Structures are given as structure tokens and as C-alpha cells.
């Protein structure tokens, strides 16, 4: 009998293939496994987005196949208070937040972790995230997933070593095709289900339509940053993010040349969207950033200069940088090379090789 047989693991079952295979792998490792389906959003009956019922049915089918119990819990109130309201506040302020990071911080590794431990008597929780846990000197580290294309450590940088110590990430050691293959061999209901895309509470709905239901759009001018020439009208600053080139409606401007136009700045006070031509326009480039609301996985604040790499958005190549503490829970990050489309409100996440050190929210970008 495995040493794990006395250990109870609650797997966050999303109705997707990754959490399905995670439950199976933990069973194979000898753990006592149960599933938990979290409902984090109350849908409106009049929308087409009703995937929660399908996801729950898929999670139940997988649990039935594996012979494990599935619990359900409703965290919609916690989600609204701790994730969604902050998401709206950030958009109102002209920034671009990442609600998936907030959801992991407030729901999956806080509300879920507490519920699993206190109500279900769990020793661990597990999720289908593509990350790895590595314990060194009694502290748990967060490592990138083995599959570089699927690594999700960027979304989990707010976790502390204590939270990681209570979490298992079985698919983090695998590549995505291996996960699909296991699901197909087991004939799991989720084997061929496509990966979910988009923000969890919006699903496949059009983002602008969704946002307009909660924040009134305020149309305003689009100006060329080089000469203040009017280029058109935007429907609301909240619909645009730095570096965006699609959906501006200003293609083919007279005497405009061939290069595409990009969003390079937002003047929230005056409701102006600034654009420039070319993906290497100086106003699009940043030499660094200032970050706040810092989270370090080892819980040790930075006290000296640090050489490492940083990601300023998911699925982006690492940028070599120097991080300097400013005190007051802020840091300056200087890139070795200028980098495009650094976006306030998004997260900057730091790495030493495969180890995720932590990160913070981008407060401003440095343009010199």
C-alpha cells in the first residue's frame, strides 16, 4: 500500500481534460481522491453563455468513471466581491487587469483551499494547472510546468510557499499531448473537449458586449501621438489596451503609409486614446516598469538588487532585467532591451530559470 493512502486530496474539477487527468494520476499515486466543482459565476438566463451546466455534467461523468465522489460549492458571492468588483474598478481607471490571477489568489487557492481543509477534511488540494512544486529546505517552490507552451506559473505568482505546500499539480510534469492521450485511453468524457479560452466569467461571449453591461461606454477621440491629428472615435477607453492594433477602425488613413496603427497611450482624465504607427514606435516601447502590490512566493521582501527575468504578460518570452526595491512595497524593473506594450494593471512576474519568484501589478511603464 502506498504511503499516500491515508492522505485525502480534493481535486478542483472544472469539467476540463487537465483536472480530469489530474484526478486519475492522483488515484494512481495512491491518494484518497474526491472532486469539487466550484460555481464562481451566476449566469443570466438570457445569455448564450451557459457552459457551467455542461462543465458540471462533464466533471460528474469523469468522477463516475473514476469512481470518486464529486462535491459542489458556490463561491459566486466571494467571486463577485473579491474578483469581479476589482476587475471593474481597474477597467474604470483605464487599466487592464488580469482576473484569472485574482481568481487563483482569492478563490482557487484561498476559498477552495479553506473549504477543502475545513469542510472536507483534505490534506491537499489539487488543480489541473501546468506548474510544478519543488520542496527545498522545508519550503515549497513554484516551478514552470514541463510543457513550455502550457506553463501557467504566470497566473499563480500570488501563491505563498504555504499555499503551494498544500497543493498538488499532477499534470505539471507532463506535456499537453500526453494528458490528452491519457484521457483518450481512459475514454474520459473530457478527452476531446477543447481548452477553455477567455476570462472565466465571460466565456466565449464578446468581451466588449459583456463589459458594456456593467460599465457605461464613453466614446471619445483617437489622436495620433506624433501630431495630435484626429484619427477617429473610440467607443470607450476600457475596450483598448496598450499595444492593441485590431479593432481601432483607422486602417488605410490618407498619407498614413503602410504600417499598422497601435494603441500607445490612454489619457483617462480627458478620455483620449493615443495611437502611433509601427510596432517599434518609441511611444510603444518601455525601458522598464514600476510594480506595486508585490507577492513573493517565499514571503521574503526584496532588500537588494536582483538580476532575473520577467514576463509582463502570459505567453511572452522572458525579458532579462534588474529589479531594485524602492521601499513602500514597490520595485523598479529595468529591462536589458526596450520592450513593447508593457501595460499598467497587468502583472509582472519574475523568474530565476524555472523558479517563479513572485511578481506584482504594473503601476507605470518607464519610457526612458
UniProtKB/Swiss-Prot annotation:
Annotated EC: 2.8.1.13
Top-rank taxon, per record: Bacteria
Protein localization: Cytoplasm
Any GO molecular function: ATP binding
Annotated GO CC locations: cytoplasm
Binding site for ATP: 12-19, 38, 128
Protein name as it appears in the record: tRNA-specific 2-thiouridylase MnmA
Organism: Pectobacterium atrosepticum (strain SCRI 1043 / ATCC BAA-672)
Lineage start: Bacteria, Pseudomonadati, Pseudomonadota, Gammaproteobacteria, Enterobacterales
Amino acid at each position: 500500500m502506498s504511503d499516500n493512502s491515508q492522505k485525502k486530496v480534493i481535486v478542483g474539477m472544472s469539467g476540463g481534460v487537465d483536472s480530469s487527468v489530474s484526478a486519475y494520476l492522483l488515484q494512481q499515486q495512491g491518494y484518497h481522491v474526491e472532486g469539487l466543482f466550484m460555481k464562481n459565476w451566476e449566469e443570466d438566463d438570457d445569455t448564450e453563455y451557459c457552459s457551467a451546466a455542461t462543465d458540471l455534467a462533464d466533471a460528474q461523468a469523469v468522477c463516475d468513471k473514476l469512481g470518486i465522489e464529486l462535491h459542489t460549492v458556490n463561491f459566486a458571492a466571494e467571486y463577485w466581491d473579491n474578483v469581479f468588483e476589482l476587475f471593474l474598478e481597474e477597467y474604470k481607471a483605464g487599466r487592464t487587469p488580469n482576473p484569472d490571477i485574482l481568481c487563483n489568489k482569492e478563490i482557487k487557492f484561498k476559498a477552495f483551499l479553506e473549504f477543502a481543509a475545513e469542510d472536507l477534511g483534505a490534506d491537499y488540494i489539487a488543480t489541473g494547472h501546468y506548474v510544478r512544486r519543488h520542496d527545498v529546505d522545508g519550503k515549497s517552490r513554484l516551478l514552470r510546468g514541463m510543457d513550455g507552451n502550457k506553463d501557467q506559473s504566470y497566473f499563480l505568482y500570488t501563491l505563498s510557499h504555504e499555499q503551494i505546500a498544500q497543493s498538488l499539480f499532477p499534470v505539471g510534469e507532463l506535456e499537453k499531448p500526453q494528458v490528452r492521450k491519457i484521457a483518450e485511453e481512459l475514454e474520459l468524457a473530457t478527452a476531446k473537449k477543447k481548452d477553455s479560452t477567455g476570462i472565466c466569467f465571460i466565456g466565449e461571449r464578446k468581451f466588449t458586449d459583456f463589459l458594456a453591461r456593467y460599465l457605461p461606454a464613453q466614446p471619445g477621440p483617437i489622436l495620433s501621438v506624433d501630431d495630435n491629428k484626429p484619427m477617429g472615435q473610440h467607443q470607450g477607453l476600457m475596450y483598448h489596451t496598450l499595444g492593441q492594433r485590431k479593432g481601432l477602425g483607422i486602417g488605410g488613413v490618407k498619407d498614413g503609409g503602410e504600417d499598422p496603427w497601435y494603441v500607445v497611450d490612454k489619457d483617462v482624465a480627458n478620455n483620449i486614446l493615443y495611437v502611433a504607427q509601427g510596432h517599434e514606435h518609441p511611444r510603444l516601447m518601455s525601458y522598464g516598469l514600476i510594480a506595486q502590490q508585490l507577492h513573493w512566493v517565499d514571503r521574503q521582501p526584496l532588500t537588494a538588487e536582483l538580476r532575473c527575468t520577467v514576463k509582463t504578460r502570459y505567453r511572452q518570452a522572458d525579458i532579462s532585467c534588474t529589479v531594485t526595491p524602492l521601499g513602500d512595497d514597490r520595485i523598479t524593473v529595468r529591462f536589458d532591451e526596450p520592450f513593447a506594450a508593457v501595460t499598467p494593471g497587468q502583472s509582472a512576474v519574475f523568474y530565476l530559470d524555472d523558479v517563479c519568484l513572485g511578481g506584482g501589478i504594473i503601476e507605470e511603464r518607464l519610457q526612458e
